[in-house]
Amino acid sequence: HTPIRRQRQMCIRDRLNHNVNSANWNSQDSIWELEIKDKDGLKNITSSFLFLCGGYYSYSKPHIPNFRNQENFKGQIIHPQFWNNQIDCANKKIVVIGSGATAVTLVPAIAETAEHVTMLQRSPSYIVSWPSEDVKNKFLKKFLPIKITYFLIRWKNILYQSYMYFMAKNYPERIKKNILDLIKDELGLDYDVDKHFTPSYNPWDQRVCLVPDSDLFKALKENKASVVTDTITEFESDGVMLDSGQKIIADIIITATGIELNSLNDINVTIDKDKVNAHSRLTYKGMMLSGVPNFAYSFGYVNASWTLRADLTCEYVCRLINLMDKKGVECCMPIDDETAYGDDDLIDFTSGYFQRGLHFMPKQGNKAPWKSYQNYIKDIFAVRLFSIKDSNLNFYSSKDK
């Protein structure tokens, strides 16, 4: 019954349907002062530690380009971030604008009931099919306990992903050829893979999209969906006119055109009412900010499973708070290191949404612990195994000042 009691206690502490407007660190009292909003209006609460786990993009402000004459379109224009179950795609002609993870996920799902789905892209992304069920996992579970199987399969996937990322960065042409050869095997030699599936950049300069069980390629082969690589001239009443002169008829247009980054979950974070500009600060171990007390944020991997890094971050924050309790101190703060500043952005990615939002994100430094490795093996040592106490992290109480 103990786990059930703990779950109930956690639920009592959870506050759903609350929006955090602002968070101010009060140095005199060593406390975070939060302004939150719920259905009853504004409220104020306090917290001794602030841990942001709201992701890395804005939920309320997606990236929506302004297409010429889009007001002339008579059908629905929908952004996936505002999707709802009332949208009926059955027997409709649908255009999905975009080529990223959202687009390649939506297209095969919608194609099951739609008359036809067109994925309209300005430029292609790398797309790789991946089985939804791991055959090795299925085999090992016949002979081994579930926990051992889970451990082995998890590390198999971690090491394989790390290896593929290493190969892509060091032998990009080889990996590029392998990916394109796999797509040609899926779609046949008569399909124009060079035009529709060959990006202008190298693998892992931007994220590689995974599609489960070749569902996107199956939709293309069955003519339930198609890919058009072109740029948009304007919207018309019944579809989209392209720069090539081609017109795509549509009942619904879905703008899978990307996200907008935010580093602080759209919260106005201040210290004694002075605004915290994340971009002017260094990231400490990829989860704290220089000069900001009792604060952490969860930012995962862009080149592997997001939750691998998120798990490490949660572990570290728990260890940190326990250490503060053990030491009997109120505060911990990464001390700003002027010698660590360089020109390195947090993530070396060329994706449009990263380039648009880098000025919101913290900087990474030129040495540990200010570097963001985006490498699970290195982070295990830096975050999980190494001691929390180091010369860059100051522990203190307000009475010490």
Residue ranges and their predicted role:
Residues 19, 34-62, 229-231, 236:
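Ligand-binding pocket scaffold of soluble enzyme catalytic domains
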Residues 16-31, 225-243:
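A conserved short coil-to-beta-strand element within the FAD-binding core of flavoproteins
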Residues 52-192, 225, 248, 290, ...:
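Rossmann-like dinucleotide-binding core of oxidoreductases
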Residues 311, 315-401:
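C-terminal active-site-capping segments
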Residues 256-324:
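Glycine/threonine-rich phosphate-binding loop and adjacent beta-strand/alpha-helix elements that clamp
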Residues 45-58, 94-97, 232, 240, ...:
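Short hydrophobic core segments
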Residues 1-8, 12-14:
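Single conserved hydrophobic/aromatic residue that forms the stacking wall/gate
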